[in-house]
Amino acid sequence: MLQKLKNSNIMDNEIKELMISADKVAHVQLGNPLEHALLVLIKSGYSAIPVLDSSYKLHGQISKALILDSILGLERFELERLNEQRVEDVMEEKIPWINKNSTFSRALAMSINHPFICILDDDRSFIGILTRRSILALINRYLQK
């Protein structure tokens, strides 16, 4: 089975072909209150989403877990803090990303530990995401041939 993958041209696939474009990706912006971020996360069904600025530059990632951890008090969730804190106060800044011209094998390796990888253009502007699901679906198609 591994030999089949090695002999195929799967590694020649461009990640742009598997990418979900930025206009279809749920995201929040710097300056948004945590309440807004939590609403976007809940409505989208995602556990984490990218954090962008007004120029579509990637700054980090916000997740339900980060938000809940930031409002967790000693005895209760301090829900009032959802409007007091901003996305940039709790976001994760070190996140996985690759350039749009990166190889499929690099994306595959990164997807092992991350459910999605942000894709940036040469100006480091956010252009979309590559999901672990789309990578696995492509591999599955090659294995079924």
Task: Describe each region flagged by the PLM.
Residues 1-145:
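Tandem CBS (Cystathionine beta-synthase) repeat/Bateman regulatory domains
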